[in-house]
UniProtKB/Swiss-Prot annotation:
Subcellular location: Cytoplasm
Gene that this sequence comes from: bpt
Catalytic reaction equation(s): N-terminal L-glutamyl-[protein] + L-leucyl-tRNA(Leu) = N-terminal L-leucyl-L-glutamyl-[protein] + tRNA(Leu) + H(+); N-terminal L-aspartyl-[protein] + L-leucyl-tRNA(Leu) = N-terminal L-leucyl-L-aspartyl-[protein] + tRNA(Leu) + H(+)
Stated name of the protein: Aspartate/glutamate leucyltransferase
Origin species: Chromobacterium violaceum (strain ATCC 12472 / DSM 30191 / JCM 1249 / CCUG 213 / NBRC 12614 / NCIMB 9131 / NCTC 9757 / MK)
EC number(s) reported in the record: 2.3.2.29
Coiled coil: none
One Gene Ontology term, aspect cellular component: cytoplasm
Transmembrane recorded as keyword: no
Family: Belongs to the R-transferase family. Bpt subfamily.
Length: 242
């Protein structure tokens, strides 16, 4: 760690939020630990925080800090060790006709329309289905680190947008939204495979997938990518099979 990075880390403070209803496990209360101030968290510091289990939502860098629950497990894919299974290989082949490009963080009405459609279809009543353009921008387009949008199209039609952070040692998959009526392309799976390939091309070691939660269907799918590493007891280790 450089003297500059050491100084920045020393300048970071942490506070715990008040309890709030958990978004993933019904009936439970959650808390978060938030790193502040946001302006002190540059790419190097953020990369260190991600390795400690933190994530980003807009300008907020946080990790779970619940009183009586440790269900949220940070996970990452080691790029050089990852081997797609048969289903994932089929998804990759099916997506061969899609074009993808990196874009800067900027408002695009077509992206926002897809985001709204995705939220209202997949997560109706989940708190984000009525996000207006400002709320969308605060969540997707505000960042103090090296962030880009990955845009995916098929025959010119917008199919998916993914918000990705570049870290010192990998890519962090922050948020992805896609055509909710396309049930054939397995767009979410394709996105993970694409990010693995991008990380490999960039010479990066990991793709950070956020939190794995065994009892939450929309988060448990991550264990389908192997070998998957999890942060447990302050150490990254391979998640057992099964």
């Amino acid at each position: 760690m450089s003297h500059r990075e050491a100084g920045q880390v020393a300048a970071i403070h942490f506070y715990a939020t008040a309890p709030y209803p958990c978004s993933y496990l019904s009936g439970r209360q959650a808390r978060s630990q938030v790193a502040i101030p946001a302006e002190a968290i540059d790419g190097g510091v953020y990369s260190q925080l991600v390795r400690l289990g933190f994530r980003r939502s807009g300008l907020y860098t946080y990790r779970p800090y619940c009183d009586s629950c440790q269900a949220c497990i940070p996970v990452r894919l080691p790029v050089d060790q990852f081997r797609p299974n048969r289903t994932q290989r089929k998804v990759w082949r099916r997506g061969a006709g899609m074009s993808a490009r990196w874009l800067p963080l900027a408002f695009d009405a077509e992206h926002y329309a897809l985001y709204r459609w995705y939220q209202q279809t997949r997560h109706a009543g989940g708190g984000m289905s009525d996000d207006d353009a400002q709320q969308y921008s605060e969540f997707i387009l505000k960042s103090g680190v090296d962030s880009h949008l990955a845009e995916f199209r098929l025959d010119g039609e917008l199919k998916m947008v993914s918000l990705v952070d570049r870290l010192v040692d990998g890519l962090s998959a922050v948020y992805t939204f896609y055509d909710p009526e396309d049930s054939q392309s397995s767009l979410g799976v394709y996105n993970v495979l694409w990010q693995v390939e991008q990380a490999r091309m960039l010479g990066l070691s990991y793709v950070y997938l956020g939190y794995w939660i065994a009892d939450c269907r929309k988060m448990a799918y991550k264990s389908g990518y192997r070998p998957l590493q999890m942060l447990h007891g302050g150490r990254w280790q391979t998640m057992p099979e099964g």
